Amino acid sequence: IMSIMDKLKKNSKIKTSEVLSESKFFTEKDMTPTDVPMVNVALSGSVEGGVAPGLTVLAGPSKHFKTSFALLMAGAYLKRHSDAVILFYDSEFGSPQSYFEQFGIDTSRILHTPIANVEELKFDIIAQLEAIDRDDKVIIVIDSIGNLASKKELEDAMNEKSVADMSRAKALKGLFRMCTPYLTMKNIPMIAVNHTYQEIGLFPKAIVGGGTGIYYSADNIWILGRQQDKKGTEIQGYHFVINVEKSRYVKEKSKIPITDSWDGGVRKYSGLLDCALAGGYATKPSNGWYAAVDQSTGELGPKVRYDATLDKSFWDPIFAETDFKDFLKKQYSIGHQSLVSMDEIVEEADG
């Protein structure tokens, strides 16, 4: 005799309907770790997590290395899946071929799609998402939605009409509302680069551009802040703070420090020292010197300069011999009590 569950399942017009306990949409999300532990923490709350299916928005002012972070994630996805491709929607045209190669990305595995307006992006991306199967390995990068006009705005310019465009936010909201179910059902990560603007007021804060629709649809939203990394008077790169504005895994308003240098891109072990100092896993015995702290005896390891703390040899023993991974998880992931304040970590980064 057919059970009521079997009857409902057989009668469903949705071919992916499944008993919840067996549904592939409610299994643990497949995460792709990047090479940078603190980027994984910012994405998932764990050094072992990473890029997951769904929409990740990287927002910030111009020249905040937003595309760098997007390509770091996309490169990790290609490295993990040998048959994966990047669907790259480009409205900025600011990424030369050498930029992709810097992140170890084979440009023959990228479908480059230039876009001029929101509607063009919407029609193409929905057609692509319709055609992709759940087993296809695809990661989508949009660079950027911040600079994308609506079709109406372009038509008004061509017809020499100087009226305000009220359709852009609505078009973007519709675009992401349509994309979101596909990303989950077809297991696709999508990374969208966006701009921010400052709200008006005595204490202005950064607002993600493009209206509220992006907020509702996104799984992760980062707002990137930065300061110069100087050696004497020479700028070597930038110290970034990833401000987690929204996340399914990470506590909102978390602050995660990351360093990016001119010559080496995103520094693999950056941000870890700031957390280790705040949590007592490392210390600063004297100005300009750092040392790991033995958690059972309190003894200090060898004193090293800052550059040596960006090396694998400094971190391997800390990860292997202490509960530093758990400290990071408790500090950043939802459902755990933070052990130190976020501001304390960022103060260490500033110091």
Predicted regions and their residues:
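The Walker A/P-loop phosphate-binding site
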Residues: 3-109, 127-130
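Hydrophobic "anchor" residues on beta-strands that sit immediately upstream
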Residues: 86, 139, 190
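Short, ordered loop/turn segments at secondary-structure junctions
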Residues: 91-93, 115-117, 145, 195-196, ...
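Catalytic P-loop NTPase motifs of RecA-like helicase/translocase cores
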Residues: 95, 148-149, 199-200
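Phosphate-binding/switch region of NTP-binding enzymes
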Residues: 165-279
